Amino acid sequence: MNVSVNIKNVTKEYRIYRTNKERMKDALIPKHKNKTFFALDDISLKAYEGDVIGLVGINGSGKSTLSNIIGGSLSPTVGKVDRNGEVSVIAISAGLSGQLTGIENIEFKMLCMGFKRKEIKAMTPKIIEFSELGEFIYQPVKKYSSGMRAKLGFSINITVNPDILVIDEALSVGDQTFAQKCLDNIYEFKEQNKTIFFVSHNLGQVRQFCTKIAWIEGGKLKDYGELDDVLPKYEAFLNDFKKKSKAEQKEFRNKLDESRFVIK
């Protein structure tokens, strides 16, 4: 199998400023030291054609940051991502404008993807039908529920037939019938040897759908490998974490966060 996505030593840093004065110092003084947060820290992994990789981890671990970097909407501070093919990201509201109607968003988003108006016109009926939005397709997206936005975003991205698909919690909202229809459609992608990154807290879906697991903890890649090797370890960790009191869970998160802040 060919490598479709090669993530090489990817780090994403955010400078933290408490005041505008700190921000100005950082902009004007060369090599000025300031508090920096490591959203991701030196992550490397390879995805091959046909891989369905579940990105798992507790809230704030860095899963969405990584998915955005894979999708190209976010650039790493250090490192690089090589992609062999077109990438499409499905996340709640990703790339949608609240001021535009659903049908206007279809045209706008597909123009941004590089499609011609003639191609968009031909594909639009299929997108509308898959979305199940009916007359709401002519309403401004700002009036949509999160489930409706997810339906529209998924319908656009699945119809353009990408080589690499990044799904970030897009199936966590909306009705179960639509979610199952989406999964069935994704299975078709899987059979076509496309590469899929699947971000979800629903471990049932992860187990049903994924072939590999990338466990992100505190911005680092804690484990990566075959589903049957990594998922049981993550489930054991998650069960232990859920048994902790709220105070103990908070302490665990705080320790992880503290390790991600440095002065540089």
From Swiss-Prot:
One of its GO terms (molecular function) is ATP binding. It holds the Pfam family ABC_tran. It is found in: Cell membrane. Keywords: ATP-binding, Cell membrane, Membrane, Nucleotide-binding, Translocase, Transport. Residues 5-243 form the ABC transporter domain. Its EC number is 7.5.2.4. The keyword Zinc does not apply. It comes from the Bacteria. ATP binds at G57, I58, N59, G60, S61, G62, K63, S64. SUPFAM superfamilies: P-loop containing nucleoside triphosphate hydrolases. Gene3D superfamilies: P-loop containing nucleotide triphosphate hydrolases. It is a peripheral membrane protein. It is an enzyme of class 7 (translocase). It catalyses: ATP + H2O + teichoic acidSide 1 = ADP + phosphate + teichoic acidSide 2. GO terms for cellular component: plasma membrane. InterPro entries: AAA+_ATPase, ABC_transporter-like_ATP-bd, ABC_transporter-like_CS, ABC_transpr_TagH-like, Bact_Polysacc_Export_ATP-bd, P-loop_NTPase. Signal peptide: none annotated. Part of the ABC transporter complex TagGH involved in teichoic acids export. Responsible for energy coupling to the transport system. The complex is composed of two ATP-binding proteins (TagH) and two transmembrane proteins (TagG). Belongs to the ABC transporter superfamily. Teichoic acids exporter (TC 3.A.1.104.1) family. This is Teichoic acids export ATP-binding protein TagH. The gene is tagH.
